[in-house]
């Protein structure tokens, strides 16, 4: 396989507005003190759109403005300037929220309810009838891997288990748009992988997902496009593969290449003036290594091939 890098820019042309689920224009947020003076600029003027059926990542360090952006989209706080539209409606229009599922960074759930009671409660808030609540609760509990713990009170749950039931409550209304703030927080590597698989599955079901994270691997693995925020300002916007592509570098990948053949390939490249030639085995990631070890001990069924299986 030969991959030729091409120069790209972080900005992209807008698509048909009918395909846009979320749109912000010059959206900003400044927190002020008691006297109305500017205290902190949490978000500088932001222009972006999220397209139907994609997984969109908001990436940035702590304090970059990611959670502020999500709260503005949900209408939980009001912008200082600009506008945010969700499904073509103003973000401050609460009627849009019936089509949204939201997992906050910290899940504030009733700790004396069990998983079934929790989902029944949120189902009531959306006006679901009893049979539909039971059906959806059972399916979601199985989806997030809490079937064995469905009768335990949430106060007995670990943080990872709490995140799982939090995702389930975000899906109880079968939303079109799912907003996840740090969805892998508190999860071990196995739980993280399962959470990322769940997010990808949501896309396959036709959902639009906005995922907020400061973990690079999480965003790289699941997102179609990303926006990189830093100190409240949009720094990059585009498709993941475009932003990660290194220009001016050609990558050649082959299996079953003998040392002699590798040396011959290197000699050909040198004759054509190639510089900084590196021919060797590709590296796997720590996550893949860990998951493979667990899989080999029958603790995890992981069907996709590991990069380590392709080593020469």
State where each predicted segment sits.
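Conserved small/polar residues in nucleotide/adenosyl-binding loops
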Residues: 302-307
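Catalytic Walker B motif of ABC-type/P-loop ATPase nucleotide-binding domains
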Residues: 178-182
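ABC ATPase "signature
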Residues: 237-238
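Conserved ABC ATPase "signature" region
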Residues: 27, 120, 124, 131-149
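A short, flexible loop at the N-terminus of ABC-type nucleotide-binding domains that lies
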Residues: 14-21, 30-45, 52
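Conserved ABC transporter NBD signature motif
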Residues: 82-98
């Amino acid at each position: 396989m030969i991959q030729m890098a091409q120069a790209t820019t972080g900005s992209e042309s807008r698509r048909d507005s009918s395909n846009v689920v979320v749109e912000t224009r010059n959206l900003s947020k400044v927190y002020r003190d008691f006297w109305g003076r500017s205290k902190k600029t949490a978000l500088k003027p932001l222009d972006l759109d999220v397209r139907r059926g994609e997984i969109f990542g908001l990436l940035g360090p702590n304090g970059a403005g990611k959670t502020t952006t999500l709260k503005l989209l949900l209408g939980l706080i009001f912008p200082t300037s600009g506008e945010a539209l969700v499904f073509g409606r103003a973000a401050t229009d609460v009627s849009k929220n019936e089509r949204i599922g939201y997992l906050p960074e910290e899940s504030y759930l009733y700790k004396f309810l069990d998983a079934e009671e929790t989902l029944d409660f949120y189902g009531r808030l959306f006006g679901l009838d009893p049979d539909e609540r039971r059906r959806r609760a059972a399916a979601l509990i199985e989806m997030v891997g809490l079937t064995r713990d469905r009768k335990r009170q949430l106060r007995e749950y670990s943080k990872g288990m709490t995140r799982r039931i939090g995702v389930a409550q975000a899906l109880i209304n079968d939303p079109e748009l799912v907003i996840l703030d740090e969805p892998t927080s508190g999860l071990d590597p196995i739980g993280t992988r399962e959470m990322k698989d769940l997010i990808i599955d949501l896309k396959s079901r036709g959902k639009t997902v906005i995922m907020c994270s400061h973990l690079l691997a999480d965003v790289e693995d699941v997102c179609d496009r990303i926006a990189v925020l830093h100190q409240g300002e949009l720094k990059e916007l585009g498709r993941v593969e475009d932003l990660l592509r290194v220009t001016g570098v050609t990558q050649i990948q082959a299996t079953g290449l003998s040392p002699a053949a590798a040396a011959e390939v290197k000699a050909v490249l040198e004759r054509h003036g190639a510089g900084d030639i590196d021919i060797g085995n590709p590296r796997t990631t720590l996550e893949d290594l860990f998951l493979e070890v667990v899989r080999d001990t029958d603790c995890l069924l992981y069907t996709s091939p590991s990069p380590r299986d392709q080593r020469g």
